[in-house]
């Protein structure tokens, strides 16, 4: 039965193209787990939001990315995503430089923060826009741990200057692990199943 389900999905993918509007290797890996064939066509627009709350910023930017790519591929299903980190009401995006990465990691050390991933899935039959939030508790970090991690270069392309999959800084989380990585796989999978079943 599972093989039949996968076969049906592959047949639908031949008819209806699925596009991930992101260059993120982490999002590519997570979407691959859902067993859909897809293309990667990243958005290139400026990532500026007029929203006030971090969770709304993530949704607005995800919406903008998806719509930008959808305009060029109106017969496709397009997924746009954006991930932000919030601590004490303040937004942490990707660090501009190593100094800012250190500031972010120092601020997160020993505290609880939220990771919001906004997702927009666009198809000619409709738009699905949502944000998933995960609470993350950081361990207390020494300056050496922070500087050693920054020296790897890993923080520079990640919201909040860390990746949960490679830092070892997280004590525990409440919510979706995949969401912290940048792609709430379960919710996206539910929506795609609805779209491709029609």
Region annotations inferred by a language model:
Residues 9-12:
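Short, positively charged and aromatic/hydrophobic N-terminal segments
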Residues 29-33, 49-50, 71-72:
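Short loop/helix-cap segments at secondary-structure boundaries that form the rim of catalytic
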């Amino acid at each position: 039965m599972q093989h039949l389900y996968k076969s049906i999905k592959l047949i639908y993918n031949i008819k209806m193209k699925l596009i991930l509007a992101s260059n993120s290797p982490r999002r590519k890996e997570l979407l691959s787990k859902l067993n859909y064939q897809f293309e990667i066509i990243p958005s290139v627009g400026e990532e500026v939001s007029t929203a006030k709350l971090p969770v709304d910023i993530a949704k607005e930017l995800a919406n903008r990315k998806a719509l930008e790519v959808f305009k060029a591929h109106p017969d496709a299903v397009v997924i746009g995503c954006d991930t932000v980190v919030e601590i004490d009401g303040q937004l942490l995006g990707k660090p501009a430089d190593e100094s800012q990465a250190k500031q972010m990691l120092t601020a997160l050390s020993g505290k609880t923060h939220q990771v919001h991933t906004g997702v927009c899935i666009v198809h000619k039959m409709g738009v699905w826009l949502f944000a998933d939030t995960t609470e993350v508790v950081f361990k207390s970090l020494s300056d050496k741990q922070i500087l050693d991690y920054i020296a790897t270069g890993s923080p520079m392309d990640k919201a909040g200057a860390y990746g949960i999959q490679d830092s070892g800084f997280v004590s525990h989380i409440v919510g979706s692990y995949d969401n912290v990585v940048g792609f709430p796989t379960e919710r996206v999978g539910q929506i795609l199943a609805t779209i491709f079943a029609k």
